[in-house]
């Protein structure tokens, strides 16, 4: 007997969780009386601010509907606890690195990650205490840029141990100091990783979280995940899950493409317009439904390849 078609399995072999706080590009504006909506002064609108999680390769993990306000440490810890329980139930040996911005860098999160064996690298909001460590470095970096402005921005790094008064212990802090024509720019991150080089920690580990904004764009813009017009919060949460399923289908379609082809990095809307929106003739027969595709269409070769991979998307 022939072997059944291999189903596409949503494995999570990678070690990084991209924890995204929906910011400027992901504000979910609403125009009705939906539950959990709050007013956002920045946008001058009512809306939601869901927590969205991806892994390091773009797999969709989860999305939780919530009001448009900064989450507290206890809320974040409770969310992390449920998320880790679900991951460990299926992938008990997967190592997890949590990357997130300063809105999630709270003492509750730091203590919980340490107690549960999670690696983390989080953005830290600048404070007077932290700036005391890099005052001289900022001055020398600015002088270096002014001495040779044509060479571009000057960037330097420094690491030290310090912490906020609310933290239970001091943490390893990495400061990135940059000077350019636009003025000085300093960022701080906190981490428990063993990587020694501060530049590698910031540029090769932390900065990769910027790719998550592209995942957010694919989910929200190309798949219309911001259509949360139901009155009940549970109904809008279900909408997020349905759009998560759509994301998985499109992501699975994209990763089935040849590795060195343009389709492997194509946006979801490109895949939909070029490969999915193809005219076809559907014929209903007694024992089957036959689909007749056009004899010619754009990207016909890649379409033929995609049709051969469709069984992998069946779950």
Feature locations, PLM:
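Short, conserved catalytic/metal-binding motifs centered on acidic residues
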Residues: 10-28, 58, 97-105, 120, ...
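Short, surface-exposed basic-aromatic patches at helix termini and helix-loop junctions that form
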Residues: 110-119
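A short, flexible helix-boundary coil/loop motif
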Residues: 249-315
């Amino acid at each position: 007997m022939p072997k059944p078609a291999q189903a596409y399995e949503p494995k999570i072999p990678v070690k990084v969780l991209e924890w995204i706080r929906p910011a400027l590009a992901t504000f979910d504006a609403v125009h009705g009386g939906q539950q959990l909506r709050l007013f956002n002064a920045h946008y001058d609108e009512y809306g939601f601010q869901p927590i969205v999680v991806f892994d390091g390769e773009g797999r969709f993990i989860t999305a939780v509907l919530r009001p448009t306000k900064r989450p507290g440490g206890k809320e974040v810890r409770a969310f992390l606890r449920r998320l880790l329980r679900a991951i460990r139930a299926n992938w008990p040996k997967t190592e997890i690195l949590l990357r997130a911005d300063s809105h999630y860098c709270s003492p509750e999160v730091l203590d919980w990650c340490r107690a549960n064996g999670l690696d983390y690298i989080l953005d830290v909001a600048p404070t007077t205490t932290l700036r005391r460590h890099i005052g001289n470095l900022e001055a020398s970096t600015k002088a270096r840029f002014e001495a040779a402005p044509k060479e571009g921005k000057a960037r330097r790094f420094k690491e030290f141990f310090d912490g906020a008064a609310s933290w239970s212990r001091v943490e390893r802090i990495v400061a990135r100091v940059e000077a350019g024509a636009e003025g000085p720019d300093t960022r701080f991150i906190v981490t428990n990783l063993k990587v020694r080089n501060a530049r590698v920690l910031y540029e090769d580990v932390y900065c990769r979280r910027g790719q998550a904004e592209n995942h957010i764009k694919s989910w929200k813009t190309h798949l219309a995940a911001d259509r949360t017009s139901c009155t009940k919060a549970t109904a809008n949460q279900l909408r997020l899950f349905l759009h998560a399923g759509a994301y998985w289908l499109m992501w699975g379609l994209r990763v089935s493409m040849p590795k060195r082809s343009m389709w492997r990095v194509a946006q979801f809307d490109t895949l939909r317009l070029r490969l999915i929106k193809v005219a076809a003739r559907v014929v209903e027969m007694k024992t089957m439904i036959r689909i007749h595709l056009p004899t010619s269409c754009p990207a016909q070769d890649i379409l033929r390849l995609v049709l051969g991979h469709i069984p992998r998307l069946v779950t």
